[in-house]
Amino acid sequence: MALFPAFAGLSEAPDGGSSRKELDWLSNPSFCVGSITSLSQQTEAAPAHVSEGLPLTRSHLKSESSDESDTNKKLKQTSRKKKKEKKKKRKHQHHKKTKRKHGPSSSSRSETDTDSEKDKPSRGVGGSKKESEEPNQGNNAAADTGHRFVWLEDIQAVTGETFRTDKKPDPANWEYKSLYRGDIARYKRKGDSCLGINPKKQCISWEGTSTEKKHSRKQVERYFTKKSVGLMNIDGVAISSKTEPPSSEPISFIPVKDLEDAAPVTTWLNPLGIYDQSTTHWLQGQGPPEQESKQPDAQPDSESAALKAKVEEFNRRVRENPRDTQLWMAFVAFQDEVMKSPGLYAIEEGEQEKRKRSLKLILEKKLAILERAIESNQSSVDLKLAKLKLCTEFWEPSTLVKEWQKLIFLHPNNTALWQKYLLFCQSQFSTFSISKIHSLYGKCLSTLSAVKDGSILSHPALPGTEEAMFALFLQQCHFLRQAGHSEKAISLFQAMVDFTFFKPDSVKDLPTKGQVEFFEPFWDSGEPRAGEKGARGWKAWMHQQERGGWVVINPDEDDDEPEEDDQEIKDKTLPRWQIWLAAERSRDQRHWRPWRPDKTKKQTEEDCEDPERQVLFDDIGQSLIRLSSHDLQFQLVEAFLQFLGVPSGFTPPASCLYLAMDENSIFDNGLYDEKPLTFFNPLFSGASCVGRMDRLGYPRWTRGQNREGEEFIRNVFHLVMPLFSGKEKSQLCFSWLQYEIAKVIWCLHTKNKKRLKSQGKNCKKLAKNLLKEPENCNNFCLWKQYAHLEWLLGNTEDARKVFDTALGMAGSRELKDSDLCELSLLYAELEVELSPEVRRAATARAVHILTKLTESSPYGPYTGQVLAVHILKARKAYEHALQDCLGDSCVSNPAPTDSCSRLISLAKCFMLFQYLTIGIDAAVQIYEQVFAKLNSSVFPEGSGEGDSASSQSWTSVLEAITLMHTSLLRFHMKVSVYPLAPLREALSQALKLYPGNQVLWRSYVQIQNKSHSASKTRRFFDTITRSAKPLEPWLFAIEAEKLRKRLVETVQRLDGREIHATIPETGLMHRIQALFENAMRSDSGSQCPLLWRMYLNFLVSLGNKERSKGVFYKALQNCPWAKVLYLDAVEYFPDEMQEILDLMTEKELRVRLPLEELELLLED
């Protein structure tokens, strides 16, 4: 039979020998044509064999022949043996490749794989020994059909539908919709070529894996892999050069010797002299001597020896001086350095690496040292605090609280310990609640008051107790404000004002506890309190009670109903979370004052819709403290005004400074770029005023309160201004007028002309009323503010008249009055900052003002150009006055306030005078002269800081003059061409001395943002953050990177199109995240709500929602009291609004609009 049916005719043609030989390959002589009939018969008999129990997959056709040859039997037996051996090998050797030796019947891998599978359905009909009709062909046929499958398609005689019934089907065929890969015939492709195609124009892509052998290329491991980290932990080999006699001549080239000078030693075992000692021993069959093998371990390197020497030195010193707590603390800090070295404490081999990387080992070692230190110093609070801080890694929060309570019980007079204890309890999310922390503040202040009064005889009051108590009181007020309980915070301030300034004489000699008991009836009497209309104070109420009689209450007919929004929800189509946020913030803004029943309207306590707005005496009684210092009493008023949003110039104490920061106004330059010389820029910002919980990034200007809030502030001013006199009263008037001017600036910024007109009118009315008072007639601070107001309103000529009038009233004070110098300075600065069209004439006016300041004659208005002789005389007068002030500063200790303020104003005026008459370099020389004099005389070490009161006062002088210096440089760069380097250098030097100055940081970040090279900025920030304790460097470093990221994105998205980056900057996102994480490692950073708000806002802006949620919950672990964090989370994750509000309710934060009430409002 022909292999190819198409050539069947050619192969069977009776041709000659040559043609027959050519087509001989088309025929298969070993195939018997007569076997087709027997194959078809055996195929039909297959079901019968299946029913008899034969396997389905390999049901070989049985042969009926009795004359089977011995050769066929042997072939069959060997094939079966091979199959069994293969099965055993597959069972016991799954991962080894074995050679498969096949006989003549198994020539391809596909046939072997198919035969080796059992119990699988097969497409072919199994063949067995075939009965042959011809004896000479029987052996070959039997051998061929006994070991090969025969496919149904190959059997040409079978007609019709041929199939087999599988009694044991494979369910995998139905599940996977295809045959098992072992049942599919496979073959090996020899090359990827294909015959018949043009390789230049055509190609075939074969499916499956490529036949080319893949060469696995070993990649170089990075430094952070596990293996490389292990290599980094291996001890380094100490390398030391050979000692050579020093040469007197300088060596320009140091040669490296490749070989030793001496000839190698040769032996019979080492004929070339190239083997080392270890190789020689190995060739002899010997090992190294035991002592020699242990020698490297016995001799440590120089680094380990130095560390061991330090450890021994510490141990010796603490044995000799066990009372030295600082030495113990240094020993604890030294453990970090010891653990970085290769395990000095390793006991067994292999233990070194584990101990080196074990944080727990370091903590245990530190804890053991601290316990030894506490045994020798039972009264040391610092050691016990260090132990508690260390044990936060080991102990549960409840255990830590108990240990803190024990420590507080032992040291109830330690204010620093109370401060840390309150912060610890305030930042423990698991045990935190507003009521618990509020009562804890009350317990703290009442205990310290008892210590200060002497009621606790066992513990005397420590120095600075009163100042620390005042700082804790302010910290409690900001805590309540940030938690949303504004009513309680305002009530605390109201009570403290009455308790401090209006105390009856009959109770002044009593201890604080007794005074508080007498104060309770006044609080519950319904008498108007500080800030409320008709408030007279505690003392007047006591006199009225002692005298008896009735107090007639006259209702105010002009008093309208308080302004309330008739429609609290203005747009019901907005999403639910937006409606809630708007309504919640609106209620926070309107309802920050405590609710009290109005007797004129016959109201009772039951008329209050929200009981949380009422403040009981139990909420504030324990927190009342007695302030005997006059400075602290004035600071109390300033803090109250700052709390209400009035720029009083008060900066919170360092202990609660960053706790109070919760909004990003510290980055707002405002109008500073337009008016660098005259724009009011407060030294401190970042803390929201009461009632404000705006979203992050909302422009924060002094917009003022609503009508009731403005009336409340006016009442506070009217109540407290008669309590002070002199400079303090002048400062209060200045703050009030500055608050009104700030609202005018807000109207100018928003271009609200209607409100600007009314606000300007009210502000001028207030200024005139204040100047009409007899004690304020010669108050140059108020005259200065009034003239500045007229200038801001655009009334330049009226403002000049006010300035001229005030300067004419001064007479011939020359340069001795600091307020007069400040008035002249502002007048000159306003003239200088006029538009470029009139700047030449304005400069002449400014020179006239500063020149007249030095003359003994009365001031006269500007008439024309100042003569050169008068300018020279004025310069000499400034020089002599400055020398006199600097000479006094070196002698006087402590520095008087008047002397400091006079030096500041005089230096400013002289710098501006030199700038206008000579140039910017002359002004810079004045600054350098003052700085060098003060820095060398007051701070001999050149650090610019000191611990004494005198050093702090002179530091403030340098800081103010530095601000003038930088402002002058900025103005000069604005009006003329000037390099940026001097301003950058001046700011860099100033920030190293004053790292907490927000004004300097704002200027530095702004000018550095214009530079396309961020490397210097980053190095500078890195230097400052490593050494400075304040948090401002971290905040402004983050802001600088965010501004740079915004600039890069703006360039990349020019005109709404994606373009290539012209500023190649990568890694900004990760750099900013790293800055956030590093800033939060300190205690001040981890408990600063502003830092967490910025971090959360940044991650949300990147679109990383899951990471943002993680940061939000991490923020709650550190600042669970900050309501603004929860409001931000509602804005960023509106789907989880219900969960966030439930969390606020659980922690007792103030929720003014519950969701149930919101649903009712939406239905209405």
From Swiss-Prot:
Residues 61-383 form a coiled coil. It is found in: Nucleus speckle; Nucleus, Nucleolus; Nucleus, Nucleoplasm; Nucleus. Residues 61-73, 110-133 have a biased composition (Basic and acidic residues). The modification N-acetylalanine is found at residue 2. Residues 163-266 are annotated as: MID/MTR4-interacting domain. Its main location: nucleus. HAT repeats lie at residues 305-337, 395-427, 758-792, 978-1010, 1067-1101. Transmembrane segments: none annotated. Signal peptide: none annotated. Keywords: Acetylation, Cell cycle, Cell division, Coiled coil, DNA damage, Mitosis, mRNA processing, mRNA splicing, Nucleus, Repeat. InterPro entries: NRDE-2, TPR-like_helical_dom_sf. Residues 74-103 have a biased composition (Basic residues). Changing residue 189 to E: Loss of interaction with MTREX associated with decreased RNAs stability. One of its GO terms (cellular component) is nucleolus. GO terms for biological process: cell division; DNA damage response; mitotic cell cycle; mRNA processing; mRNA stabilization; negative regulation of RNA catabolic process; positive regulation of RNA export from nucleus; regulatory ncRNA-mediated heterochromatin formation. Changing residue 166 to R: Loss of interaction with MTREX associated with decreased RNAs stability. Protein of the nuclear speckles that regulates RNA degradation and export from the nucleus through its interaction with MTREX an essential factor directing various RNAs to exosomal degradation. Changes the conformation of MTREX, precluding its association with the nuclear exosome and interaction with proteins required for its function in RNA exosomal degradation. Negatively regulates, for instance, the degradation of mRNAs and lncRNAs by inhibiting their MTREX-mediated recruitment to nuclear exosome. The MID/MTR4-interacting domain is necessary and sufficient to mediate interaction with MTREX. Belongs to the NRDE2 family. Interacts with MTREX; the interaction is direct and stabilizes NRDE2. Interacts with EXOSC10, EFTUD2 and EIF4A3. This is Nuclear exosome regulator NRDE2. The lineage of its organism: Eukaryota, Metazoa, Chordata, Craniata, Vertebrata. The gene is NRDE2.
